[in-house]
From Swiss-Prot, chain B:
<comment type="function">
    <text>Carrier of the growing fatty acid chain in fatty acid biosynthesis.</text>
</comment>
<keyword id="KW-0597">Phosphoprotein</keyword>
<feature type="modified residue" description="O-(pantetheine 4'-phosphoryl)serine">
    <location>
        <position position="37"/>
    </location>
</feature>
<dbReference type="GO" id="GO:0005829">
    <property type="term" value="C:cytosol"/>
</dbReference>
<dbReference type="InterPro" id="IPR003231">
    <property type="entry name" value="ACP"/>
</dbReference>
<comment type="pathway">
    <text>Lipid metabolism; fatty acid biosynthesis.</text>
</comment>
<dbReference type="GO" id="GO:0031177">
    <property type="term" value="F:phosphopantetheine binding"/>
</dbReference>
<feature type="domain" description="Carrier">
    <location>
        <begin position="2"/>
        <end position="77"/>
    </location>
</feature>
<keyword id="KW-0963">Cytoplasm</keyword>
<dbReference type="GO" id="GO:0000036">
    <property type="term" value="F:acyl carrier activity"/>
</dbReference>
<dbReference type="GO" id="GO:0009245">
    <property type="term" value="P:lipid A biosynthetic process"/>
</dbReference>
<dbReference type="InterPro" id="IPR036736">
    <property type="entry name" value="ACP-like_sf"/>
</dbReference>
<keyword id="KW-0275">Fatty acid biosynthesis</keyword>
<dbReference type="InterPro" id="IPR006162">
    <property type="entry name" value="Ppantetheine_attach_site"/>
</dbReference>
<protein>
    <recommendedName>
        <fullName>Acyl carrier protein</fullName>
    </recommendedName>
</protein>
<keyword id="KW-0444">Lipid biosynthesis</keyword>
<dbReference type="InterPro" id="IPR009081">
    <property type="entry name" value="PP-bd_ACP"/>
</dbReference>
Amino acid sequence: MRRVVVTGLGMLTPLGCGVDATWARILAGDSGCKKIDTFEVSDLPSQVACYIPRGDGSGGTFNPDQWMEPKDQRKVDDFILYAMCAAKQALDDADWHPKSDEDQFATGTMIGSGIGGLTGIAETAVLLKERGPRRISPFFIPGRLINLASGYVSIEHGLKGPNHAVVTACSTGAHAVGDAARLIALGDAEVMVAGGAESPISRIGIAGFCAARALSTGFNDTPQKASRPYDKDRDGFVMGEGAGVLVLEEYEHAKRRGAKIYAEVTGYGLSGDAFHITSPPPDGNGGFRSMSMALKRAGLAASDLDYINAHGTSTQVGDEIELGAVERLLGNAASKVSMSSTKSATGHLLGAAGAIEAIFAVLAIRDNVVPPTINLDNPSVQTAIDLVPHTSRKRDVNVALSNSFGFGGTNASVIVQRVTN
Amino acid sequence: MSEIGERVKKIVVEHLGVEPEKVVDSASFIDDLGADSLDTVELVMAFEEEFGCEIPDDAAETILTVGDATKFLEKNAKS
């Protein structure tokens, strides 16, 4: 099969607009969480979220007008705007701006979302009830559809290869990276713009996840402490928003044009739990199988892993089940592996999570450093695995695996590794 | 320009993101101001909202320029 490498990165996260802005704050152990202040929360059990920092665009802030025309912003839900921001960063970083038919036909998009335009759908439903169908905007549908993130990005940048989108809840971003890499490996594209975007911080979004008992409710007055994977006081995840996009490219294509190569995507595993709509099975066999499959695909042993970016959302049940599956996978190698949950800092970006976390895995390899699990004061279980509490750590990272698990019992694991010839 | 004309112009500038100077009576929404077919549907909705009147589909089809809109609304505006 053809080899696939990462040649461009772009992200918009609660820690900043841009890869450098986000990564610096991740390594510093910062939290992106704050009290919700954009809608009424007095009747909601969870009142904290990880917002992207909006501003004039300076100092790592997000200025929407730099990424999408104001007249187009009005037509779409924010997840599309966020995808546009991350995709432009990634394409600029890769220095890939296809102009010829050949290059445009060879470049595709696969940007997914967990939920898509939830906010716009909720607002429009109210409008329909109160004012009737004549008030529904012609942009209502195209501005909410999940695949319109890929659609807008492909139109903006003239990308005429595969135009696809993943929808697998919280494993969307990881599936997008893995599936896009596969399209390149099989020869359907030379370059793929892949990732995820999510804009779930709205009254209906928080209310919905609260009803599913998924969100943290005990840290409303200390938001920066709310996301605390593996800690004994964890009580649910914290909703985050943003987007992550990677430019994936066939290895020889990247070499020919002298592209900067960050890492190689060597492993990808997928599995289903067939157990419950929101809970993983107690033995974590779905996650175990997706990790095992990714290792097999990469031709690696578990002992080859240096860093695991965990799914680790900070829920009572999920964190320990994943940890158990990872321990089973690693066996005696557990003590040499570092595993952290960057969701402790970013919150849970749902469909964008797997994409930003694949980027963190790539950056861990680039910089030989592992990002921390912040707020991990008292681990709820003892483990030989280094969970990187509180502070980032320099260490050799040549092989990194990123896990993402989603509602519906869907699991994905992606392995990236340092490029060797 | 009439008061209604000014209000039409404001809506067009806002919805299509174009320079105010370009929004003249003879300007065609699609050919001169960069609108697509969905934009024109939304523009008609915005006119209905602003002027408190209904613009039936057959009338909307005849509103192709800024001047067409102003002329129609000068006759039919309710607010």
